[in-house]
A protein has these predicted regions:
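Extended amphipathic alpha-helical segments enriched in small hydrophobics
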Residues: 74-156, 353, 357-364, 389
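Polyanion-binding catalytic cores of nucleic-acid enzymes and NTP/SAM-utilizing transferases
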Residues: 1-40, 100, 107, 126-153, ...
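A glycine-rich phosphate-binding loop feature that marks nucleotide/adenosyl-phosphate handling sites
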Residues: 69-74, 107-118, 172-176, 210-214
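Beta-sheet entry/capping signal
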Residues: 7-10, 34-36, 47, 77, ...
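Terminal accessory regions of large proteins
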Residues: 124, 143, 152-153, 160, ...
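Short, flexible loop/turn elements at secondary-structure junctions
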Residues: 9, 13-15, 37-41, 79-84, ...
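Short Ser/Thr-interspersed hydrophobic loop/turn segments at strand-loop and sheet-helix junctions
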Residues: 2-20, 48-62, 193-195, 303, ...
Length: 440
């Protein structure tokens, strides 16, 4: 316990790859899965970090830990010699580069803003910003290669192992995040949704709102925390495969792009986003407008990416009517309160039922006056809408039941516990909680 919250080095004890030590600043604790070591002489920490990430360390560990169980015993028995070269600044630079790289991810505690959004002041075309980011990323990767090879050579020379070891580092072994057009756009979209929810803001860097029950959110709005790009009023964002609501996610993504990159290149930027998403996330459709492609990604793939990013502990929860996707929406768990479901019902589900019914009635009239292929097409459209209507009506019955219960959540219980409180209103309940949802 006397070492808790002290500066040290940590590593993953069970791994199929080589040992990789990481620097831990003051303020953190550790456990058996992520053990830590502490230098007797604090000034040696950078030399030890360089040594335990060099090629030399693996020679010793092949004999001390042949099963690749890097527990404290084998690691503690590795002999250490301080290098004759001064590598302190080299190792500090490597730590800074890797930390800055990690902090570009939303899941980092020190995440500030999205890379492409940050570049928007200088590049009004997202494609130009991405090209700059890609070139800078390559420079950093080659800088890391240079630094790691210097570190390797320092210890190879020290142990006189030049005949059996090369200091060369393969680019594939450098663990920095690579610039990738599709991934960078996916991250930008995720950040934009964070801004819609109020988790992030274009006016403030870092995490802006992550309290409980929407408490204090109105005060943030009053302070002007979301002045440039207003956050959603209730933290409920419709995620629809068609445009049924003015404030659905797709419409707000377009608004976000306009706000950040401006009006002049809006269409070109939307097309770049759509093109990027079609590189891997979704298949391209010939002649499909850019905004429709973005909508298709959001309605079919965003949730999967979000689940992957947050390792099945999502912060935006997907409420779904079911298989036909008659209604789906995202709710930010930190803004959820016991009135959220009632609002979801009155503001979205009930009005959508009325719209579905009106469209079914309209299609019935058109079917009566049509013939041949046109009649067949209209009937197919009507039948599809009828299925959605029936699914949504069933969802509304269940939603009303849970809304009347005025369910509260406690963030201290974690996502796994809280996500299971809403029966089958939510998507992928079993994947998140481990149990099948309660069906009423």
């Amino acid at each position: 316990i006397q070492f808790y919250c002290k500066e040290g080095l940590t590593w993953t004890s069970l791994t199929i790859s080589s040992l990789s030590m990481r620097y831990v600043p003051n303020g953190y604790i550790f456990d058996a899965k992520g053990p830590m070591c502490f230098p007797i002489n604090a000034a040696d920490i950078w030399d030890i970090l360089g040594y335990t990430n060099s090629k030399i360390i693996n020679i010793f560990l092949k004999h001390l830990a042949p099963t690749m169980d890097y527990s404290q015993g084998p690691v503690g028995n590795v002999p250490f010699k301080s290098p004759t070269r001064n590598i302190t600044n080299i190792i500090k630079e490597l730590v800074t580069i890797h930390k800055n790289d990690w902090d570009t991810n939303e899941i980092s505690f020190e995440f500030q803003t999205n890379i492409l959004v940050k570049l928007a002041n200088d590049y009004k075309k997202i494609s130009d910003g991405y090209t700059f980011r890609e070139n800078e990323n390559k420079k950093i990767i080659y800088r890391v290669k240079e630094l790691e090879e210097y570190n390797n050579s320092s210890f190879i020379d020290l142990f006189e192992l030049n005949d059996i070891l090369s200091p060369e580092v393969n680019l594939s072994d450098i663990t920095l995040d690579r610039a990738a057009q599709e991934n960078d756009i996916i991250k930008m979209i995720s950040y934009s949704i964070g801004c819609m929810m109020g988790r992030y803001s274009l006016d403030r860097e870092g995490l802006v709102y992550a309290h409980e029950g929407n408490k204090g959110f109105a005060e943030l709005v009053a302070e002007g925390a979301y002045k440039t790009f207003p956050a959603d009023n209730d933290g409920i964002l419709p995620l629809m495969d068609e445009e049924w609501f003015d404030d659905d996610v797709t419409s707000r993504v377009k608004e976000f792009v306009r706000t950040v990159w401006g009006e002049e290149h809006l269409q070109e930027n939307l097309e770049f986003i759509a093109e990027s998403l079609c590189l891997y996330a979704i298949s391209p459709k010939k002649g499909e407008p850019a905004l429709d492609t973005i909508r298709r990604y959001l309605s079919t793939q965003f949730w999967k990416e979000h689940m992957k990013m947050y390792k099945k502990r999502p912060i935006y929860w997907l409420f779904s009517s079911g298989k036909t996707k008659a209604f789906e929406c995202l709710v930010y768990l930190h803004r959820y309160n016991d009135a959220t479901l009632a609002r979801m019902r009155t503001e979205y589900v009930v009005p959508l039922l009325a719209r579905y019914q009106a469209n079914i009635d309209r299609l019935n009239e058109l079917v009566d006056g049509a013939s041949g292929g046109e009649a067949t097409r209209l009937k197919r459209e009507r039948d599809s809408l009828s299925k959605k209507f029936n699914e949504l009506r069933s969802f509304d019955d269940r939603l009303r039941h849970y809304a009347d219960m005025r369910i509260s959540i406690d963030l201290d219980d974690g996502v796994k516990v809280n996500y299971g409180k809403f029966g089958d209103l939510l998507a992928d309940v079993k994947a998140i909680t481990g149990n099948a949802p309660e069906v009423i």
